[in-house]
Amino acid sequence: MASRKEGTGSTATSSGSAGGAVGKGKGKGGSGDSAVKQVQIDGLVVLKIIKHYQEEGQGTEVVQGVLLGLVVEDRLEITNCFPFPQHTEDDADFDEVQYQMEMMRSLRHVNIDHLHVGWYQSTYYGSFVTRALLDSQFSYQHAIEESVVLIYDPIKTAQGSLSLKAYRLTPKLMEVCKEKDFSPEALKKASITFEHMFEEVPIVIKNSHLINVLMWELEKKSAVADKHELLSLASSNHLGKSLQLLMDRVDEMSQDIIKYNTYMRNTSKQQQQKHQYQQRRQQENMQRQSRGEPPLPEEDLSKLFKPHQAPARMDSLLIAGQINTYCQNIKEFTAQNLGKLFMAQALQEYNN
């Protein structure tokens, strides 16, 4: 994933300027107790995101962009967006922060909502739970509390149903990211698990009345589809690819568990050595005391037994979260196909 799109520096700069505007609009001056209960998206934004992926998304390459809108009480209204342009690392003259500011300034001149309220990203078979996404969303949410990230799945959408979800970091994870302490003890103290990292926010897509009337007319004019078309099974390629990605993440989790178990064994071994050293030291001092000799001076055990560095556990949580996402996708895929098989069987028995 390109650093320009998910680098915390550029995101924080542009979000910070938008954050003050959002605070003004709410009249709170950036209160910390507000929460987003719902995300309302204009149909234009959805079409722009889909069009952006169709024009620039290829294979595993993701597309990203900025979401614009405003906050109304506990509802985040996304009214417009613009994409990040595709460019290579050789484009040293490109300034992504300047690009964002110029785009928002241009939108303001034509009286379009220009407040920065989040960002969007496409995903490849649900592969979006990454450290880069975590860092970017933390940067956005730290600057503007109501910020969300929209995840668009083009593969699911191509199968006939729009897949667009909004996520935010949970308050617990925000506190851990602020402290930047991802040690096992810190995560255990904060009660952070992969299930408590992201929270999904309900999405409502809103269209104007004229667009709703047009869609109603188009639906009336559209050709009647085969009544049995909905019973067609989805392609097995999706299931195979999801299983392959799931196995890759399980392998990564296995390697991470091995590293953590090695750390625990080394720590336990060092504790035993420290305990044995203290016992020997105590026995030697007792012998010296019986001979009337002064005890040996105390030594700094931290210098003799340097503690092992605990591995950071955030990557493990992200891998576990991604595994959970793959499992949910596979569950949805198989449930739909099994339902179609049972319906097809019932229809066949009825016709016979």
From Swiss-Prot:
Gene Ontology CC annotation, any one: eukaryotic translation initiation factor 3 complex
Keywords: Cytoplasm, Initiation factor, Isopeptide bond, Phosphoprotein, Protein biosynthesis, Ubl conjugation
Region described as Disordered: 1-34, 268-301
GO MF, one example: translation initiation factor activity
Superkingdom as given in the UniProt entry: Eukaryota
Keyword hit for Cytoplasm: yes
Biased composition (Gly residues): 17-32
Positions bearing Phosphoserine: 3, 183, 191
CDD domains: MPN_eIF3h
Ranges where the MPN domain occurs: 39-173
Keyword hit for Protein biosynthesis: yes
Subcellular location: Cytoplasm
Covalent link Glycyl lysine isopeptide (Lys-Gly) (interchain with G-Cter in SUMO2), residues: 303
GO BP: formation of cytoplasmic translation initiation complex; negative regulation of proteasomal ubiquitin-dependent protein catabolic process; translational initiation
Main localization of the protein described in the UniProt heading: cytoplasm
Low complexity compositional bias, start-end: 270-289
Functional note: Component of the eukaryotic translation initiation factor 3 (eIF-3) complex, which is required for several steps in the initiation of protein synthesis. The eIF-3 complex associates with the 40S ribosome and facilitates the recruitment of eIF-1, eIF-1A, eIF-2:GTP:methionyl-tRNAi and eIF-5 to form the 43S pre-initiation complex (43S PIC). The eIF-3 complex stimulates mRNA recruitment to the 43S PIC and scanning of the mRNA for AUG recognition.
UniProt record similarity statement: Belongs to the eIF-3 subunit H family.
Assembly information from the UniProt record: Component of the eukaryotic translation initiation factor 3 (eIF-3) complex, which is composed of 13 subunits: EIF3A, EIF3B, EIF3C, EIF3D, EIF3E, EIF3F, EIF3G, EIF3H, EIF3I, EIF3J, EIF3K, EIF3L and EIF3M. The eIF-3 complex appears to include 3 stable modules: module A is composed of EIF3A, EIF3B, EIF3G and EIF3I; module B is composed of EIF3F, EIF3H, and EIF3M; and module C is composed of EIF3C, EIF3D, EIF3E, EIF3K and EIF3L. EIF3C of module C binds EIF3B of module A and EIF3H of module B, thereby linking the three modules. EIF3J is a labile subunit that binds to the eIF-3 complex via EIF3B.
The protein's name in its UniProt record: Eukaryotic translation initiation factor 3 subunit H
Species assigned in the record: Mus musculus (Mouse)
Gene name of this polypeptide: Eif3h
